[in-house]
Amino acid sequence: MQKTFFIIKPDAVKRHLIGQVLDRIERRGFVIERMEMLMLDEERLKEHYAQLADKPFFPSISEFMMSGPAVIGIMSGPGVIKSWRDMMGATNPGDAAPGTIRGDFATAPDGDMIPNIVHGSDSEESAAREIKIWFGE
């Protein structure tokens, strides 16, 4: 069974959208194997976003991701990585179609891709790496 890592980001937590996001996951038939609400830390964020850690905009990402609690988790199901990415919608909320999580809930100004409600691994390799970073598995 395929697994993926997800984050319900601080903007969604602040707006009380956790239940609505989880409802969509469960209605799709995916199994939430692990889940935890926590304050994300800079050390693991640098590891998670390793390809961005030396970019000039990384401090903005880090500051946002540490601005409040987030929900991290592991879900599983057939084709969960692609399906979850489709459910999330385009990374830029302004490009996200209605019916996707970002299209329905994201309120970031067009072009601001940081507060975009959710994160999901983009490949099996990324999922394994992100699960190890956040859950030690």
UniProtKB/Swiss-Prot annotation:
As recorded in UniProt, its EC number(s) are 2.7.4.6
The record's SMART domains line, in alphabetical order, gives:
NDK (SM00562)
What cellular-component terms does GO give this entry? Answer: cytoplasm
Tell me where in or outside the cell this protein is found. Answer: Cytoplasm
Superkingdom of the source species: Bacteria
Which cofactor does this sequence's record say it needs?
A: Mg(2+)
The record's annotation in InterPro entries points to:
NDK-like_dom (IPR034907), NDK-like_dom_sf (IPR036850), Nucleoside_diP_kinase (IPR001564), Nucleoside_diP_kinase_AS (IPR023005)
Q: Which reaction does it catalyse?
A: a 2'-deoxyribonucleoside 5'-diphosphate + ATP = a 2'-deoxyribonucleoside 5'-triphosphate + ADP; a ribonucleoside 5'-diphosphate + ATP = a ribonucleoside 5'-triphosphate + ADP
Residues of the active site are: H119
Which EC class, in a word?
Answer: transferase
Asked whether the UniProt record includes Zinc among its keywords, one would answer no
The keyword RNA-binding appears for this protein: no
Keyword annotations: ATP-binding, Cytoplasm, Kinase, Magnesium, Metal-binding, Nucleotide metabolism, Nucleotide-binding, Phosphoprotein, Transferase
An example GO biological process term is: GTP biosynthetic process
Question: What GO MF annotations does this protein's record show?
Answer: ATP binding; metal ion binding; nucleoside diphosphate kinase activity
User: Mind telling me which SUPFAM superfamilies this protein's record contains?
Assistant: Nucleoside diphosphate kinase, NDK (SSF54919)
Functional description taken from the UniProt entry: Major role in the synthesis of nucleoside triphosphates other than ATP. The ATP gamma phosphate is transferred to the NDP beta phosphate via a ping-pong mechanism, using a phosphorylated active-site intermediate.
Question: Whom does it interact with, and what assembly results?
Answer: Homotetramer.
- NCBIfam families in the cross-refs: PRK00668.1 (NF001908)
Tell me the protein family, please.
Belongs to the NDK family.
Q: Which protein, by its recorded name, is this?
A: Nucleoside diphosphate kinase
UniProt gene name? ndk
